Regions:
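Long, contiguous binding/interaction regions
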Residues: 2-67, 77-79, 94-170
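Short cationic amphipathic helices and targeting signals
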Residues: 82-90
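Short beta-strand elements
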Residues: 69-73
Length: 170
């Protein structure tokens, strides 16, 4: 395990590569649903002991929820973070509801970024299945509002993540 800082260019390149990988999976499984996991880990170090704990918890939750219906599962350990992909015959809507249930009920679920990718490579929104947007890790505002406005300091975010993980591993 290494704790290497990544650059913005690396992060942006990893997003492009992830989108390309998702399109390849979708092409290989036409008519099926793709679920993609990334770990929410603010800062320049995306791969550390905390992100490993979160990724393992998320993978366990995904396998528990989708295990019998998984057609393919792939885990990737990259300098830009852990990623997992699963293909299921469930509808996009069924899969999105299940991933939202995991995010909303698992003790570390707020640190899971579980996307359901449609046939065009576009992630489905929570609102598309009648759910409200994700809440901020620190306060009760919408997460996207706090992210866009940089409402919380890195120290506040890190403290909250530390607290969540510490509580989970106890």
């Amino acid at each position: 395990m290494f704790f290497m800082e990544i650059t913005l260019d690396q992060l942006l390149a990893s997003r492009e590569e992830r989108a390309s990988f998702q399109k390849e999976l979708l092409k290989g499984y036409p008519g099926k649903t793709l679920v993609c996991l990334t770990v929410i880990m603010p800062g320049k170090v995306k791969r550390n002991l905390q992100s490993l704990v979160v990724a393992q918890a998320a993978v366990t939750a995904l396998v528990s929820a989708f295990g019998d219906s998984m057609l393919k599962f792939r885990l990737r350990d990259l300098p830009t973070g852990y990623e997992a992909y699963l293909v299921t015959p469930l509808s996009n809507e069924e899969a999105k509801k299940e991933t939202c249930r995991i995010e909303d009920t698992h003790p570390l679920g707020r640190l899971f970024d579980l996307d359901v990718i449609d046939a065009d490579g576009v992630p489905m929104s929570r609102e598309s299945v009648g759910l409200s947007p994700r809440k901020c890790l620190v306060c009760d505002n919408e997460a996207r509002y706090c992210m866009r406005n940089r409402t919380h300091t890195m120290a506040e975010l890190t403290a909250k993540i530390d607290e969540m993980i510490e509580s989970y591993v106890r």
